[in-house]
Amino acid sequence: MTHLLIVDDEKDIVDICQTYFEYEGYQVTTTTCGKEALKLLSSDIDIMILDIMMPEVSGYDIVKKMKDMQLDIPFIYLTAKTQEHDTIYALTLGADDYIKKPFSPRELVLRTNNLLARMSKSNHSNKIEQLEFDGLVLKNLSKTLTINNIEIPMRIKEFELLWYLASREGEVISKSELLEKVWGYDYYEDANTVNVHIHRIREKLEKHDFLPYTITTVWGLGYKFERSR
């Protein structure tokens, strides 16, 4: 049974989400307190849905603490913060989805189901186990990236995006296709999702002096993973 943690200081939202997810067969743990959420973080949690604006401890703080604990729990922000810069910042923290209030509980359940299904499919896929490019090695089963035998920390979505691009080396892939194949939805309001993740991947490759290959922006069309010119 999938263990879901819901964190929101609005009890009515917590209650309705709990009702919907328990009906879907989830084991649900809830709290309306950010401080309490910090105590509930553990490897026993399979996925987390959390608000951002909460007294004392925000949704940002909870995610940062999760990273400090070296937990890799997929999470969805459910928030009234609707500005583009809010979405971008949440994605830089590694959010797997960003849903704005007011929201449809049914849509939230479906998005969560789809996220978990993609993760399960990705984790159990053995069609291609490994890609290698002049010292860069991507291992699909373990979701790890190494450069010259040094493992580079990556969030799951960063890895999946790089894997998708690298597995189609030299091809131009549109943002809409990347959104559909990596995130599982075609949501143009969140087109910056791809930009943010591409930027973070490039930073990691450059930080570790990986120069033979690069992710190239093809203006008006998309991105491609190719040998550096």
Swiss-Prot record:
Domain Response regulatory residue range list: 3-116
Per the record, the GO terms for biological process are: regulation of DNA-templated transcription
The superkingdom listed in its UniProt entry is Bacteria
Residues with PTM 4-aspartylphosphate: 51
Keyword vocabulary terms for this entry: Cytoplasm, DNA-binding, Phosphoprotein, Sensory transduction, Transcription, Transcription regulation, Two-component regulatory system
Q: What is its main location?
A: cytoplasm
GO MF assignments = phosphorelay response regulator activity; transcription cis-regulatory region binding
Entry comment on modification after translation: Phosphorylated by SaeS.
InterPro entries listed in its UniProt record: CheY-like_superfamily, OmpR/PhoB-type_DNA-bd, Sig_transdc_resp-reg_receiver, WalR-like, WH-like_DNA-bd_sf
One cellular-component annotation, GO:
protein-DNA complex
- Report the subcellular localization: Cytoplasm
Q: Which residues bind DNA?
A: 128-227
Q: What does this protein do?
A: Member of the two-component regulatory system SaeR/SaeS. Probably functions as a transcriptional regulator via a specific DNA-binding domain, recognizing motifs near the promoter sequences of target genes.
Q: Which PANTHER family does the record cross-reference, listed alphabetically?
A: REGULATOR OF RPOS (PTHR48111), RESPONSE REGULATOR SAER (PTHR48111:SF2)
Q: What is this protein called?
A: Response regulator SaeR
